[in-house]
Amino acid sequence: NSNNINLSYDDQQRLIYSGTEQKYPTSNQLKSYPNGLLNPFNGTNFMHPTIQSNSLITRHPNNNSFQLNTTNDSNNNNTTNNGNDSRSHLYDISTFNAQNPYSLTNTLNFNSRTMNNQLTMNDSMKLNGNLTLHDTNYHALLNGSTSFGSTVFRSLVNSENQSYLNSSTNMLMNSSLDNINNSNDHSTLNDNNNDCIGQSLRQSGNSSESNVVVYPWMNPKGTDISVDQKRTRQTYTRYQTLELEKEFHFNKYLTRRRRIEIAHTLTLTERQIKIWFQNR
């Protein structure tokens, strides 16, 4: 302990932790995990199962980038180059596929026919230079296994059938115009028929009104009085109004005997006296 006093702080820390250096792994060493557990230090555990294949993703030896391999020769060259790299397991997923039950076994197969169809997509999707087909199943119908659907679909695309398409559209337009004309004619006929029916009904109504006998009991009560004979609003003279106001000042409610006396004095009917007091 006395010797450690003369040492610097860094030397003392180095002596204290000199025996524990082997307890912790270095940064370039990864722990091994049993089957079925994810390795958090390996990025391939979080990759989608569809891209975890030996023949799909490898590390380029020069620029540390990933590329696609389609042949077995490229896989062999890649394994030899990765042997020189101490951290090849961070880029190559060949060791992970041995434990991963979801590894992809099928390799990518590039079909020349599919590539040619993709290159000529714009030309094949044009119908006679004017009409463009936007259906996503267009190429699937052309390259499908069913012969009936492909032949029918190809026949519609060929330029020799343009006359058929034009004739069909013309027929549709002509039929629609004929339908419009027929509907107009039908509407005019209906209008004329309605006018004729209305005139005949009016004529029959006039004739029936002149021939029908109306008895007194058929009319409602009071309809026998003409417009001139209807009761008009009663206008009271100043003298009548004055006498009625004096009577109302003394008696707000009249008896029938007093009402008859006032009506005889003011030359009014008993009903008129009653209505005036009710309104007052």
Curated annotation (Swiss-Prot):
Region (Disordered): 61-88
Species this protein is from: Schistosoma mansoni (Blood fluke)
One GO cellular component term noted in the UniProt record for this chain: nucleus
Record-linked InterPro entries: Antp_homeobox, HD, HD_metazoa, Homeobox_antennapedia, Homeodomain-like_sf
Keywords: DNA-binding, Homeobox, Nucleus
Any GO BP: anterior/posterior pattern specification
Signal sequence coordinates: none
Residue ranges, compositional bias (Low complexity): 69-85
Compartment list: Nucleus
PROSITE patterns: HOMEOBOX_2
Ranges in coiled-coil conformation: none
Record's protein name: Homeobox protein SMOX-1
Main location: nucleus
Family per similarity comment: Belongs to the Antp homeobox family.
Motif Antp-type hexapeptide, chain ranges: 214-219
Single annotated GO MF: RNA polymerase II cis-regulatory region sequence-specific DNA binding
One Pfam family per UniProt: Homeodomain
Disulfide topology: none
DNA-binding region (UniProt annotation): 229-280
